[in-house]
Regions:
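N-terminal secretory targeting modules
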Residues: 1-30, 35-44, 58-61
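Active-site metal-binding loops of divalent metal-dependent hydrolases
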Residues: 32-34, 71, 108
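Alpha-helical cap/lid subdomain in secreted, periplasmic
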Residues: 43, 50, 54-62, 74, ...
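General small-molecule cofactor/ligand-binding pocket signal
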Residues: 67-69
Length: 151
């Protein structure tokens, strides 16, 4: 068999379903590169969702799973390197089986506009309105939610 090349990318993995007891906690971390672990040590499992998982497992008294749905460059309002956080919410949170909680950590890339078009400039008011309006519509069907600011 030929020797393969190591990579730190997940080219083909789009999800993993597991059987879990009915009382299990299922947490989705929806965010940008800070959630994805862009500056974390590769394969060290030190990203904040990894650390959260360890703490929850130690304290919850029941099975816990934390799904890291961080996407580098992701923004709240506008698509870049994939759908915006608001557009991803349905498929990356609501469509996932067994989710009981969601943590949303988005916003660092919206005001920076490095990759954006001039018409996609946003203010803090735009971001707050986007999260408030978008999540008000989506959260009525969602699990318990926690919104985190990246600032």
């Amino acid at each position: 068999m030929p020797v393969g090349n190591l990579t730190d990318q997940w080219f083909f993995l789009c999800g993993v379903d597991v059987l879990a007891p009915s009382d299990a906690l299922g947490v989705v971390a929806l965010g940008d590169s800070l959630t994805d672990g862009n500056i974390s040590t590769i394969d060290a499992f030190c990203r904040w969702p990894d650390q959260l998982a360890r703490r929850l497992v130690a304290r919850a008294g029941r099975p816990v799973g934390v799904m890291n749905n961080g996407l580098g460059g992701n923004r709240i309002l506008h698509d870049i390197r994939g759908d915006s956080g608001l557009r991803r919410f349905d498929c990356d949170v609501l469509a996932q089986p067994g989710v009981t909680h969601v943590i949303v950590m988005l916003g660092t890339n919206d005001p920076r506009n490095r990759w954006a078009k001039p018409e996609e400039e946003v203010t803090a008011e735009h971001m707050i309105a986007g999260l408030s309006d978008g999540h008000t519509r989506q959260l009525h069907d969602a699990p318990d939610s926690v919104l985190l600011s990246a600032f």
